A protein has these predicted regions:
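Domain-level signature for proteins that mediate thiol-based redox and metal-cofactor handling
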Residues: 1-67, 72-251
């Protein structure tokens, strides 16, 4: 029997009341992204149900834009949802269920058993999800970096300052609400890419760690802008497909 449940149909905002466990779960889910387009599964409206069950258990159901979405991406998102919710101090059990997908059974069983993707699909794939995750993490880094750097340039910070600013200086810089949000997203992924580096290190480098020279910044931004535009294009397609699918299911 479910003692506390919150179901949110596609198109409705998740709960946000302070202290509500459902809101905590939604907040945790908001940190999980579609790896291909670097947008959260909540903003993309993939989540169809969040349930708080007896014994501090959480059950998540989600649906992707098509029945044929790539199973490796679906597996990544499902396992990331599981891990994000499991980090909540009161959660003792997490169940994540992918709905209406051709590989849903294999994905759901594999995520529940904490299997590697190749173990969940024995004999069917050689995909190394760690390599796939790294590839899309690097693309997300470039996308978030470009957005923050362009914001800083619009706000009066010149290319010279950007090329030499340390992470400490970036953290102390006074920004608008927009800038604070962009900085938070960038710093989060910077710490994942450059784990072990400190606040004295350069805030803005290439994904390989090479310094960005002020004179090279315009060309660099043009190059990484292609990553963002591709992600935004894929995101628009994704939303359209999901909206069409939800309309068919609701009919």
């Amino acid at each position: 029997m479910v003692t506390s449940a919150h179901r949110t149909p596609a198109g409705f905002a998740p709960p946000s009341s302070a202290g509500d466990r459902s809101a905590e779960v939604w907040s945790a889910l908001g940190t999980v992204t579609d790896p291909e387009i670097d947008e959260s599964v909540t903003s993309l409206e993939f989540i169809t149900s969040v349930q708080i069950e007896p014994g501090n258990a959480v059950r998540i159901e989600f649906r992707l834009p098509t029945y044929w979405c790539a199973p490796n991406f679906a597996f990544l998102m499902a396992s990331d949802m599981r891990d994000a919710i499991a980090e909540l101090s009161w959660v003792e059990k997490v169940t994540v269920e992918l709905l209406d997908h051709f590989s849903a059974d294999l994905i759901n069983r594999g995520v529940a058993a904490r299997q590697d993707f190749r173990d969940a699909f024995p004999g069917e794939t050689d995909d190394d999800l760690s390599a796939i995750r790294k590839k899309f993490l690097e693309k997300a880094f470039e996308r978030r970096q470009e957005l923050l750097v362009r914001y800083l340039l619009r706000s009066g910070y010149d290319a010279s300052w950007i090329s030499r600013a340390s992470s400490r200086e970036l953290a102390r810089t006074q920004l608008t609400d927009e800038g604070i949000a962009l900085r938070r997203l960038y710093v989060f992924i910077w710490r994942r890419i450059f784990a072990g580096l400190g606040e004295e290190n350069l805030a803005f480098t290439t994904v390989a760690g090479a310094p960005l020279e002020a004179s090279e910044l315009p060309g660099y931004l043009r190059k990484v802008a292609l990553v963002r535009r591709n992600a935004e294009f894929n995101g628009a397609i994704c939303r359209g497909l999901l909206a069409a699918r939800n309309s068919r299911l609701a009919a």
